[in-house]
Amino acid sequence: LNCSKLIKQQGLKNVVVTNGYICKEPLTELLYYIDAMNIDLKAFSESFYKKVGGDLETVKATIHHAAKRCHVEVTTLIIPGENDSEEEMKSLSSWLASVNPEIPLHITRFFPRWNMRDREATPLETIYSLSVIASKNLRYVYEGNI
């Protein structure tokens, strides 16, 4: 927060890249100094967030609140067998469009690394097909890590 204030005083822009885990009160205070956010929406199922130690509703609330105050973009890393279903992308993109259909969505390709070497990289066909699905609800959809 302190750095954001100093940066604004210098006439510069603040961009936050975040997983979206922040309570409403500090987020509200921070947003006075933020120009843009890229929020990682890991999946659109509570079960996935429980598995990775998070909470979908908190991230959704952050996206909703931030979108009222600054430019927001959302990134979803597509992991084979975890969050790569067409139904999940329909739900995710429909919900995001209900917040604002102008919010850009970045659908990015997973590559096996670290503790997740037990699966292959996301097939390109999956990224492209999920992008088509999301584009039915959102104006700006981009494929990444391809």
Where are these regions (language model features)?
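Conserved AdoMet/S-adenosylmethionine-binding subsite of the radical SAM
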Residues: 1-120
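A C-terminal junction/extension of Radical SAM enzymes
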Residues: 111, 121-146
